[in-house]
UniProtKB/Swiss-Prot annotation:
Name of the protein: Cytochrome P450 2K4
Keyword DNA damage: no
Originating species: Oncorhynchus mykiss (Rainbow trout)
Pfam families: p450
The protein's Enzyme Commission number: 1.14.14.1
Organism phylogeny: Eukaryota, Metazoa, Chordata, Craniata, Vertebrata
Underlying gene: cyp2k4
Membrane topology (UniProt): Peripheral membrane protein
Amino acid sequence: MSLIEGLLQTSSTVTLLGTVLFLLVPYLRSSGSSSEEQGKEPPGPRPLPLLGNMLQLDLKKPYCTLCELSKKYGSIFTVHFGSKKVVVLAGYKTVKQALVNQAEDFGERDITPAFYDFNQGHGILFTNGDSWKEMRRFALTNLRDFGMGKKGSEEKILEEIPYLIEVLEKHEGKAFDTTQSVHHAVSNIISAIVYGSRFEYTDPLFTGMVDRVNENVHLIGSASIQMYNMFPWLGPWINNLTRLKKNVADLKMEVIELVRGLKETLNPHMCRGFVDSFLVRKQTLEESGKMDSFYHDDNLLFSIGNLFGAGTDTTGTTLRWGLLLMAKYPHIQDQVQEEISRVIGSRQTLVEDRKNLPYTDAVIHETQRLANISPMAVPHTTSRDVTFQGYFIKKGTSVIPLLMSVLQDDNEWESPNTFNPSHFLDEQGGFVKRDAFMAFSAGRRVCLGEGLARMELFLFFTSLLQRFRFSPPPGVTEDDLDLTPLLGFTLHPSPHQLCAVSRV
């Protein structure tokens, strides 16, 4: 552990201040004065020179601090992460107005130093401009062709479910950690779509990639990486950054090997997945003399990494939250299983059954809402000078759509801080869509895998609840199950074990 990371683990503001002031000397030597801004800017706490508001922010849980600040400063306010000015959008109405109604103004991605380090301006998630537009369009088209269309993805998920059930059955009702088995199953869906085939859960290449993705999610959300994003010159002293870069390099080499194998067996007339389709497009453009297109190796490699990472972490994490919540609230699990038994019986659940399982569907949506796995979304930036709700926001300003404040907006949800499936049910027990349900963000940067994720959550969740009863380990009560999230770029459940007892 480096000196900086050790100090960040302490709760002493004085210690943190002293450390930062000590390390600010190189920054002071290289920084110039900022220009005067125009117009009335969103309000916010007064920043300190260079430090900004970092002494007021909990870098381990910045989303909590930002929610508290919104109570004082309103639905649009300014905070300073070091010298970087950030506009925070809070509450459903404000976030929707920015991301949906003014999508062109707020639709660019803010590329932090850490994001740039592991994407280098390529791929789908952390890019802007024409390259992003083309890669996102191509990804949407091909993911639809190779899995996100109803039948293709449903078949892949139904193929994977027995493998996951088999792993859980091997525990014979004894306590186990859900992380590995759930993430392996979910990762195999995106792997089948991207590469054209699934992996065995014992394949060391596959398990290594999944483990590195999970670790990267934790590292990118760590306090030390937040410090690095504010003060990039701290990089040489941050061990988490070294680990992050090594993981990214290792993942890149593994993807290169997988792509090499697919190239050797490529049939342009029978594409197996996203990679094949990309390679065929690249080859076609090169044969026509277009050597400067966006279809180059870096965009391929980083797009694969983006799809694999996002397709593994968010859905797998949400599914784990769902199982934990069922164990914590057995009366809700009872109602889910009663509905599944009454409507489905012992046959395999299909996507078309969703309309006949309103309570189960409501529980899945409420899990996504309460789990709140992406509380600050992925940062945006303004594409031009904009006046928003009477405030001036300069072009290139970092913007945080505080999704936590949307999913827990007390103007939109009857009991925002409790697990209440009734949020998504009408008086007759039918499923009700809620406009403030923004678990996948919104606008130009809405999750491109939303359709696939919704299908995975429904089919995996119903199949597992049909087959198993989830409960705390012996000696642990429902009240003992901790819903405090593990800190990271996305919010995972804290380490825990569950028992999966067969119902058949």
